[in-house]
Amino acid sequence: METGTFKVKSGLAQMLKGGVIMDVTTPEQAKIAEEAGACAVMALERVPSDIRAAGGVARMADPTIIEQIMKVVSIPVMAKCRIGHFVEAQILESMGVDYIDESEVLTPADENFHVWKHDFKVPFVCGCRDLGEALRRIGEGAAMIRTKGEAGTGNIVEAVRHMRSVMGSVRRVQSMSPDELSAYAKEINAPLELVLELHKTGKLPVVNFAAGGVATPADAALMMQLGADGVFVGSGIFKSSNPSAMAKAVVKAVTHYKDAQILAEISKGLGDAMPGLDIKQIDPDKLISQRGW
């Protein structure tokens, strides 16, 4: 099978199903994540809460940091590029990262176009708030989708909103008659062939993870029960008071997301979760989830 095809790339992402992907900024953190059972790590210079606090322009991480993290773990390593910054993506692909996240957490480089991901052999993950956004990214070649949530807040409300929106729209498409599909594709500005495929199969053609605001094992289990295939945890692990224990607990929560007794047990004695932000108190211009289109 030819490498770099959409089938191969989306197939690779399927292997992460049921897993937790953790943001890490040092080799030491990467080891903690791997030992806790993370299925992959996201190599960053700063976690989203620090990016949010610092303001200014957030760019791709220094390649040195990414290389150092790649050397110490055997699980897949992801890295972020800015929306539309295909040269950052080219650099990351040349370094041999396993996945690229075209991420709204970084400052967008292009306000009109996302990266054309079909040009790359490496699989991409992209964020979405609704089904239209998800299908537009898949149409551009994204091999994996995640909710945008509101990164760096420790507040799960936006991730819940985005997951409910996507899953509700998937159910709506399934119930439509074939003659409604073309008009609906136009309404949500999505490729018609993907809407037709969704109607036929009843599911997205790629894995759909939860991200943005996951701060506790209960948050992770909530997103799984809402239909997520797995969970990204950004600031929630290493901004908590006991990162190693929190990391292990979140991994267990994703595995046992339907068992309330296990969830209660693993939630004990974890110390303080990361400090949280009320979304309503954030200036609308500073909402990360609004980036992208």
UniProtKB/Swiss-Prot annotation:
GO BP annotations, alphabetical order: amino acid metabolic process; pyridoxal phosphate biosynthetic process; pyridoxine biosynthetic process
PROSITE patterns, sorted: PDXS_SNZ_1, PDXS_SNZ_2
Record-annotated disulphide pairs: none
Binding residues for D-glyceraldehyde 3-phosphate: 164
Keywords noted in UniProt: Lyase, Pyridoxal phosphate, Schiff base
Keyword Transport: no
Catalysed reaction, written as an equation: aldehydo-D-ribose 5-phosphate + D-glyceraldehyde 3-phosphate + L-glutamine = pyridoxal 5'-phosphate + L-glutamate + phosphate + 3 H2O + H(+)
GO molecular function: pyridoxal 5'-phosphate synthase (glutamine hydrolysing) activity
Biological or metabolic pathway of the protein: Cofactor biosynthesis; pyridoxal 5'-phosphate biosynthesis
Residues where D-ribose 5-phosphate binds: 23, 152, 213, 234-235
Its biological purpose: Catalyzes the formation of pyridoxal 5'-phosphate from ribose 5-phosphate (RBP), glyceraldehyde 3-phosphate (G3P) and ammonia. The ammonia is provided by the PdxT subunit. Can also use ribulose 5-phosphate and dihydroxyacetone phosphate as substrates, resulting from enzyme-catalyzed isomerization of RBP and G3P, respectively.
PANTHER family listed in its UniProt record: PYRIDOXAL 5'-PHOSPHATE SYNTHASE SUBUNIT SNZ1-RELATED
Assembly, per entry: In the presence of PdxT, forms a dodecamer of heterodimers.
Family to which the UniProt record says this protein belongs: Belongs to the PdxS/SNZ family.
Protein name: Pyridoxal 5'-phosphate synthase subunit PdxS
Species name: Dehalococcoides mccartyi (strain ATCC BAA-2100 / JCM 16839 / KCTC 5957 / BAV1)
